[in-house]
From Swiss-Prot:
This is Meiotic recombination protein REC114. GO terms for biological process: meiotic DNA double-strand break formation; reciprocal meiotic recombination. Its main location: nucleus. It comes from Saccharomyces cerevisiae (strain ATCC 204508 / S288c). Pfam families: Meiotic_rec114 (PF03525). It comes from the Eukaryota.
């Protein structure tokens, strides 16, 4: 290993955020930002070294206090223009190189501020001899072409040197460059370029459709909704929109209050249904199941159905229907019983008792009513027992129920019959 060049530097600056460069130096890169640079200069010893290795490789180091490596770049000797490039402006040398240390290709930057022009020129010549790419850094557009005076130390003659976009060639190590207003930090140059781009982009008017306004709904408040959009290297654009929350509309859902039509029979029973009208409750029709001869079945109304009936009619009724077996002409007898009940309602004089039966009384299977025996006809095969009817319960009748009952013809006929009976009772 041979130390080809070693120079003490005055200031070291490093760009903290590497740029993703899949195409190397030909990639579209974001301009560096001035606040992303870190500087190191005070109370320390900094040294820039170029080492030649036996394996035809070059090692570039920046050493802190002769012990800590700030930069450690290993390159092959020869054509390195695709891996590392230098930009020079006395007394600053800037370097950018491609690193694949952590997988993807990243572009890293650092720069050095040399103590004087002599050290600057010696370092530039050493890099040029190793075939590194050296470019002249430009401070601004106005100074893209600058004429400087070059003073030679040997003969004292003045040579006119013109700086341009081409790669500069340095052949005389004793040459001193006398420049005026050319010393500028590269980070400051990048800041000027970013500000220039932001000023150019600020004049562009964006369409209103491209800005999406996010609205939040809160009750009884006016909100300032902020929508921000940020472009590359442009300041954040903030738009404040005054919005009012939308009113929340709640539509109540009507729940069907009709009880489920479910009946339970024995496994060997026939699944036939018959509707029987009763005068002891507002529900004039009940569905009962016809069972075979020799079987008795008690139909109990479930608690859920009772709660639904209470919410609709306001009555606490628990009817229990007992079906006694009969013959094939049971349907005809039931219709005759229905006609007898209707005749008693229309002609109260013919009936033995004009008063309506009490709902709290029980009709037993043998025909007794409150210990008063009443012979039940043998042809009657249906006995109905009604218990626990509370007339004082709070009635909850909805408009929907009233509309349905008014459309029910049978219910209206029953109401008319009850009205005629009551009128005749009051006339007496």
């Amino acid at each position: 290993m041979y130390e080809y060049c070693s120079v003490v530097i005055k200031k070291y600056s490093k760009y903290t955020i590497p740029s993703f460069a899949p195409n190397g130096f030909q990639s579209m890169l974001e301009p560096p930002q001035i606040d992303k640079w870190q500087h190191l200069s005070a109370n320390c010893t900094l040294q820039f070294r170029v080492l030649l290795m036996d394996s035809r490789q070059i090692l570039i180091n920046v050493v802190l206090n002769n012990s800590t490596l700030l930069e450690n770049i290993r390159l092959p000797l020869g054509d390195n223009q695709d891996l590392i490039q230098f930009s020079c402006k006395s007394p600053i040398i800037s370097c950018k190189y491609i690193s694949e240390e952590f997988g993807p290709r990243m572009l890293r930057r650092f720069q050095m501020n040399l103590p004087n022009d002599v050290e600057f020129n010696r370092t530039v010549v050493s890099l040029k001899n190793l075939n590194f790419v050296l470019r002249t850094a430009r401070t601004s557009i106005a100074q893209s072409t600058i004429t400087s005076q070059v003073q030679g130390n040997n003969n004292g003659t003045k040579v006119c040197f013109t700086e341009g976009p081409k790669v500069s060639s340095y052949t005389n190590p004793n040459t001193q460059f006398q420049t005026q207003n050319m010393i500028m930090d590269f980070s400051q140059r990048y800041q000027e370029e970013s500000e220039r781009e932001s000023n150019n982009r600020s004049n562009i008017t964006l369409p209103h459709d491209s800005i999406q306004i996010a609205q939040q709904i809160w009750p009884n408040t006016d909100l300032n909704v902020v929508q921000s959009s940020q472009d590359l290297n442009t300041p954040m654009a903030t738009q404040t929109v005054l919005g009012r929350p939308e009113s929340l509309i709640v539509q109540p859902l009507e729940v069907s209050q009709s009880p489920p039509n479910t009946t339970n029979c024995l496994p060997n029973a026939e699944n036939k249904k018959k509707k029987v009208d009763t005068t002891s409750d507002f529900t004039s029709r009940k569905e009962i199941a016809l069972c075979k001869t020799g079987l008795l079945e008690t139909i109990h109304i479930p608690k859920e159905r009772e709660s639904q009936m209470q919410s609709v009619t306001g009555l606490d009724a628990t009817p229990t229907i007992i079906w006694s077996p009969g013959k094939d002409n049971t349907a005809k007898k039931n219709t005759s019983n229905k006609k007898n009940i209707d005749d008693k309602l229309t002609n109260p004089q013919k009936s033995g008792n004009t008063h309506t039966p009490d709902r709290n009384k029980e009709v037993l299977p043998n025909g007794t009513l409150n210990e008063t025996r009443k012979e039940a006809s043998p042809s009657e095969g249906l006995t109905i027992r009604v218990k626990n009817v509370n007339r004082n319960a709070s009635r909850k009748i909805s408009k929907r129920l009233i509309k349905e009952k008014l459309k029910d013809e049978e219910f209206m006929k029953w109401v008319n019959k009850v009205e005629t009976v009551l009128n005749k009772m009051f006339e007496k």
